[in-house]
Regions:
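Active-site loop-to-helix "anion-binding N-cap" substructures in soluble metabolic enzymes
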Residues: 1-251
Length: 251
């Protein structure tokens, strides 16, 4: 049986005090978590505190996003890869692609630069998010959108992709809405992604995640999808009891 990865994207749900409390409680579940593959994505301001509090060797910590510049640079509010000691970084989440208030939308070209920087940095693995909006889904454009988003993975990125890159399919219309595609719909999209990856990064071992309203009530149903290697979970992962229930249902 393959090991399923649980990536907990806490977004802005937990402040530093909440994050520390969460990890302290998590440390008490050493036996349950011993054979699990877990990644925590706290807010940038909480990463150091989470790492200092964590005592579980198999739980890694990552950033929710990074700036396109890896070196110190005059970018107000930016966070570079060099500034924080992390194991993973999320790139291209829809909340950075589409929902920035000032409309500085991360386009596909910028996403390509970011994921390449993450993988080329050394020692950091990337989770690259793709997915369609509801309008695109209703127009039957899901594959076209994902094809365009994946296209940036060619070139330099393929040199670093093997065992360092994960693709997370997150339909934008499912994130935080409680609406989840059917297992068949998810499987069809993941199969398409795998097909495209075989062309873009031939021979690379790249995992496939699903994200979008995943919780303790639907995780078992989603686990029936053979193509899924893990889950990128938002709101439910920031609620300790829900998170533990998800972990218990993984195997």
């Amino acid at each position: 049986m393959k090991k399923i990865t649980i990536a907990a994207n806490w977004k802005m749900y937990l402040n530093e005090t909440n994050s520390i409390s969460f990890v302290q409680k998590l440390n008490d579940y050493k036996e349950l978590l011993a054979d699990k593959d877990i990644i925590l994505f706290p807010a940038h301001t909480c990463i150091r505190s989470v790492k200092d509090t964590l005592t579980l060797d198999n739980v890694r910590v990552g950033m929710q996003d990074c700036n396109v510049f890896t070196e110190p640079f005059a970018m107000t509010g930016g966070v570079s890869l060099k500034s924080i000691d992390i194991d993973y970084c999320i790139v291209g989440h829809s909340e950075t692609r589409y929902k920035t208030i000032v409309k500085m939308v991360d386009d596909n070209g910028l996403m390509g630069v970011k994921i390449n920087n993450v993988l080329a940095f050394g020692g950091i693995k990337g989770i690259f998010c793709v997915g369609e909006t509801e309008k695109e889904m209703l127009k039957g454009l899901t594959r076209d959108v994902i094809e365009r988003q994946l296209r940036v993975l060619g070139g330099e990125t393929r040199e670093y992709a093997d065992k360092n890159l994960t693709i997370a399919y997150e339909p934008v219309w499912s994130i935080g809405t409680g609406r989840v595609p059917t297992n068949n719909e998810i499987a069809q999209v993941l199969s398409f992604i795998r097909e495209r990856l075989n062309n873009l990064c031939p021979g690379a071992n790249i995992k496939l995640f699903y994200g979008g309203s995943v919780n303790e009530n639907n995780i078992e149903k989603l686990l029936e999808i053979d193509l899924i290697d893990g889950f990128l979970i938002g709101g439910a992962s920031a609620k300790f009891d829900s998170f533990i229930q998800i972990i218990k249902k993984i195997n």
